[in-house]
């Protein structure tokens, strides 16, 4: 396939490039009233040289497919062979207009625009003849990149970041974004602990600390601290931190500190930069730069990014307190991917209830046995710590980042996320969302088989306000106590070794086992007098007419037949056993005991009618019963 989307067209096809990052910038209205064009930036690594490259595309295009013979399509198809569709390329911002033109629905399209009902045009993607038109634009370019270049997975370089803020003069209990100066930042990359410190004329301990750094005392103390916090050489080698170097920089002006920090990041170009709870660090730095009178893009972005550079961080407020479901992401125009390490950790372990807290200290203790530095023997107020013991304050910041390193070295979450992103052609913000990455993988897998997938027609459908009331739930009070666990001899509603016949799980399991899907269904074979009894049996069960249910569905006698059989049984006179009773004493057969019966009471009266109180007999066994 030709590189018609102009993705890294300076490289030949099948060149050893691997996609790292994608940025899509939506159009926005400028001060002059005109709208900008959207843009897409792709970052890839040359695996032959290790160098990274950026591909900036203004007004990115989309390739979708239209059925050649739409009249043959009687319903929505999950896929069609490539030879039955034709590819259509158009600007992504005009995708729905292009679909409307190609399918003869321009009137529908223009009416929606005129009425301000822009979302209604999304229904154009549900047309039977339209295929592969509903993929996210970033994932779409990842898909075509994967078909143009090798896109093989290699090891990645990881960096770590944490900031501290001077909160001694803030108004509330917690600083607002950009409210107070950033006084300490630690950035760890390539075996070097880089610590940036803001000088403070109000705090003489900062100058004292600087003198101790110059004398080498701080580095010696730091190595002792690492051994105390993490362990001996064996433990340090386990987490790949043995022999870390220490580099401290002091600044008189805060903007110089921040500028130097991001210059170093953009010079070293680590593949990933992580912070624990990045939703605080990066938005705070962005706003702090603004408060200091500078544009964040001029400080944080790499100079190679010329087309619409951005320094933004998006917080998923819908899932703000559910870390496993949060979709935060950073849009910082650079060769480095900024990721929230806490969200990645929680998302990868979604559904596991082992972690009651995702605080750095708690996760560090559970995962790798490394915790934050405890300063409470000095003060319980972090705002006072730099004025009481500045060295401990700095070391507290450094140990925080070391805990991050130990967690990642123990879990390799970022390696997993990177692999998933490359293998599934999925942007990092959605790499944990199963419906999205499986859909992207399906698109790629089917395309390799010569098939073009259809669209997800459920996206535009209104979701029902109430769930379908189709399940039959038995009264739990009818569950036998024999299967229940007992507490102090009292059975509770808790079962061990429970088998849950959950249809919501059963149906997908059956589909997977028999490789079923809607496109593989040719039709339904109906036999003569064959009835679909699934709904009827549920309706009968709900009526609780047990005799009717037993007769109709399980071949048991109805009421009249039951009475006849019972009356025949109990009107037959004396009951006798077919074999004699055998009695054993200490394992030896002894003389059988004689069993005496009273005459059975006839079940039928002299009038031939049923006496309901007479359907039983009496017998007297030796010893009495």
Please state what every model-predicted region is.
Residues 624-625:
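Long, K/E/R/D-enriched contiguous segments that form extended
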Residues 1-488, 492-499, 503-504, 508-589, ...:
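The two-metal-ion catalytic cores of nucleic-acid processing enzymes
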């Amino acid at each position: 396939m030709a590189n018609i989307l102009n993705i890294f067209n300076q490289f030949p096809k099948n060149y050893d490039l691997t996609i790292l990052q994608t940025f899509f910038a939506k159009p926005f209205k400028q001060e002059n009233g005109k709208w900008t064009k959207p843009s897409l930036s792709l970052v890839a690594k040359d695996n032959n040289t290790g160098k990274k490259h950026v591909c900036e595309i203004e007004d990115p295009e989309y390739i979708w497919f239209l059925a050649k013979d739409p009249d043959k399509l009687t319903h929505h198809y999950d896929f069609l062979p490539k030879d039955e569709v034709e590819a259509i390329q158009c600007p992504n911002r005009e995708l729905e207009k292009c679909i409307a033109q190609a399918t003869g629905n321009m009137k529908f399209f223009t009416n929606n625009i005129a009425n301000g009902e822009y979302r209604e045009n999304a229904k154009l993607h549900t047309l039977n003849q339209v295929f592969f038109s509903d993929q996210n634009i970033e994932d779409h370019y990842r898909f075509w990149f994967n078909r143009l270049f090798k896109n093989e997975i290699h090891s990645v370089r990881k960096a770590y970041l944490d900031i501290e803020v001077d909160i001694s003069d803030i108004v509330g209990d917690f600083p607002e974004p950009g409210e107070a100066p950033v006084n300490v930042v630690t950035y760890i990359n390539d075996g070097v602990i880089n610590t940036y410190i803001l000088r403070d004329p109000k705090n003489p301990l900062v100058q004292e600390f600087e003198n101790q750094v110059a004398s080498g005392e701080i580095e010696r103390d730091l190595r002792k601290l690492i051994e105390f916090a993490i362990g001996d050489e064996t433990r340090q080698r386990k987490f790949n931190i043995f022999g870390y170097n220490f580099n401290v920089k002091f600044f008189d002006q805060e903007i110089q500190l921040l500028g130097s920090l991001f210059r170093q990041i953009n010079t070293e170009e680590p593949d990933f930069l992580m912070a624990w709870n990045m939703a605080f660090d990066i938005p705070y730095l962005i706003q702090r730069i603004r408060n200091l009178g500078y544009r964040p893009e001029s400080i944080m972005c790499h100079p190679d990014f010329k087309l619409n550079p951005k320094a933004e961080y998006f917080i998923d407020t819908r899932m703000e307190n559910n870390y496993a479901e949060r979709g935060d992401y950073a849009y910082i125009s650079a060769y480095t991917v900024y990721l929230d390490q806490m969200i990645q950790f929680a998302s990868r372990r979604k559904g596991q209830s082992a972690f009651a807290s995702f605080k750095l200290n708690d996760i560090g203790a559970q995962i790798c046995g490394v915790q934050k530095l405890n300063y409470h023997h000095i003060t319980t107020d972090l705002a006072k710590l730099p004025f009481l013991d500045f060295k401990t304050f700095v070391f507290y910041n450094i140990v925080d980042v070391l805990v991050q390193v130990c967690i990642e070295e123990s879990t390799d979450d970022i390696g997993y996320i990177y692999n998933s992103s490359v293998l599934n052609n999925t942007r990092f913000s959605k790499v944990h969302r199963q419906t999205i990455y499986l859909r992207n993988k399906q698109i790629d897998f089917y395309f390799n088989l010569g098939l073009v997938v259809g669209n997800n027609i459920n996206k535009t459908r209104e979701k029902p306000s109430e769930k379908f009331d189709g399940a039959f739930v038995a009264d739990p009070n009818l569950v036998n106590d024999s299967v229940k666990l007992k507490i102090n001899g009292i059975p509770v509603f808790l079962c061990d070794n429970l088998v849950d016949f959950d249809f919501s799980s059963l149906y997908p399991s059956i589909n997977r086992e028999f490789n079923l899907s809607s496109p593989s269904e040719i039709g339904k074979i109906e036999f003569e007098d064959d009835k679909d009894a699934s709904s009827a049996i549920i309706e009968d069960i709900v009526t609780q007419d047990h005799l009717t249910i037993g007769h109709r569905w399980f071949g048991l006698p109805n009421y009249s037949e039951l009475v006849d059989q019972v009356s025949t049984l109990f009107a037959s006179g004396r009951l006798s056993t077919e074999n004699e009773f055998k009695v054993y004493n200490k394992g030896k057969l002894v003389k059988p005991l004689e069993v005496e019966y009273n005459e059975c009471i006839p079940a039928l009266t002299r009038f031939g009618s049923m006496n309901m109180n007479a359907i039983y007999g009496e017998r007297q066994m030796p010893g009495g019963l």
